[in-house]
Regions:
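Short coil/turn segments that connect the beta-strands within blades of beta-propeller domains
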Residues: 10-12, 72-73, 163-165
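Signature of short aromatic-glycine-proline-rich micro-motifs recurring in repeat-based ectodomains
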Residues: 152-165
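Short linear interaction motifs
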Residues: 68, 139-142, 146-149
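Flexible, solvent-exposed coil segments and beta strand-coil junctions
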Residues: 47-51, 137-140
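Surface-exposed intrinsically disordered loops and tails
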Residues: 127-129, 136-142
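A short beta-strand motif characteristic of beta-propeller blades
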Residues: 52-57, 144-148
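Conserved beta-strand position repeated across blades of beta-propeller domains
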Residues: 4-6, 68-69, 159-160
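A flexible loop/linker signature enriched in serine peptidases of the S9 family
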Residues: 1-2, 7-47, 57-63, 77-128, ...
Length: 201
């Protein structure tokens, strides 16, 4: 959900919200999942069918939605972890971790296989050699997330205006919805001194 393009130093991709159990979970139906929505990043320049998915948030309570790039090293999202929707930011870091090897034998694709596994699949297919070998780059991605607002009423939706350093926020107060246009708050990113305390909600 809520996919948007991001470009950090050393990594570009699509950032999105999902209720998948982790970044390494196998493909499957997440519609019936009971997991919380967290923020994930998938690389978009990798041409192989194995795209690296990195989990950028790990909420204990509530859900994370509406992720987008905040500045060159931070992303932002809305979370109701404390019971009220607040803006959170995450500091993103990526380091090269090396190459993964793909071995293709018939319809089988083996990722970083041991020699014993390759021999077993070769004998299953009645072959003496692999069909082809491929490689793709792998990174170790990490993020540190923290609240940057502590509102009394829930932040319903947000969008980022990219190069203009602006964000929009929609809040509900009583029967009315309010739209705010705000500048990116670099001071709060540096200080990280906002605490979104748990509420009764």
């Amino acid at each position: 959900l809520d996919a948007s393009f991001i470009a950090f130093p050393g990594k570009t991709g699509i950032i999105f919200s999902s209720n998948r159990p982790s970044g390494t979970a196998k493909a499957g139906d997440t519609a019936i999942s009971y997991n919380r929505y967290n923020i994930f990043l998938i690389d978009n320049w990798n041409q192989s069918e194995f795209k690296q998915i990195s989990q950028l948030s790990n909420l204990q309570f509530g859900n994370a939605r509406f992720p987008s790039q905040y500045n060159t090293t931070h992303f932002t999202f809305v979370s109701d972890e404390n019971g009220i929707g607040n803006r959170y930011a995450g500091f993103f870091k990526s380091e090269r971790a090396g190459l993964d090897t793909l071995v293709f034998i018939g319809d089988e694709i083996l990722r970083n296989p041991r020699l014993k596994e390759v021999d077993s699949v070769l004998s299953e297919w009645g072959k003496t050699d692999v069909d082809s070998v491929g490689f793709f780059s792998v990174t170790n991605d990490s993020a540190y997330t923290f609240p940057i607002t502590n509102y009394q009423s829930s932040l319903l939706e947000t969008r980022t205006a990219g190069d203009n350093s602006l964000v929009s926020e929609v809040t509900r107060q009583g029967d009315y919805k309010y739209l705010y246009r705000l500048r990116i708050d670099e001071n709060t990113l540096r200080r990280r001194n906002v605490t979104a305390k748990p509420t009764d909600y």
